[in-house]
């Protein structure tokens, strides 16, 4: 799958807009940067709320339906279910973890890319993997880190330089190497856009 989003070109030397320069790249070349769009958690909340109203559910009912998508896995693991407040909290603070976002997207039948601000409409190129009741969709964070680090080295970027491009801190990026559970969905989506790959390349049906 190669669902690549639009890009922008930065010429050097003599670029007028210094904010669009890529740090730590040789000055005698043209660098093409992907157009990196933020993940709109507010729009995700609105989509959840619209479907909730359509089905006549309370937020507790939505959380229950989301959790029951992995009913067989839940019976085996006895994990703590997703809380309704995890869903409703996005109304006031429009952000969510990358793993929780997958639970919500699975229930909606939507792709992560369909919630990029000003991004593409939902498209089969970006479809998430199928998962049965014995699986839960999860981000493969180690694979995401390895792919990011490989491209960073190829592009000759330091961690601070890449962090500047992705509008985050270097530790947020390097921390993915040992992350046990999740990072923010916005950061995960910024990384996959920079890689020029669909989020689905880094999502798998997990047994946890």
Predicted regions mapped to residue ranges:
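A short, Lys/Arg-rich alpha-helix, primarily the initiator
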Residues: 11-72, 122-156, 200, 204
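Short C-terminal boundary/hinge segments that cap the last helix of small helical domains
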Residues: 98-102, 106-126, 196-208
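Short, basic-rich loop-to-helix N-cap that marks the start of a DNA-contacting helix
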Residues: 81-86, 92-106, 180-193
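N-terminal acidic, proline/glycine-rich, low-complexity intrinsically disordered segments
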Residues: 1-9, 15
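Residue-level detection of the helix-turn-helix DNA-binding "recognition helix"
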Residues: 67, 92, 178-180, 207
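Short alpha-helical DNA-recognition segment
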Residues: 56-88, 153-175
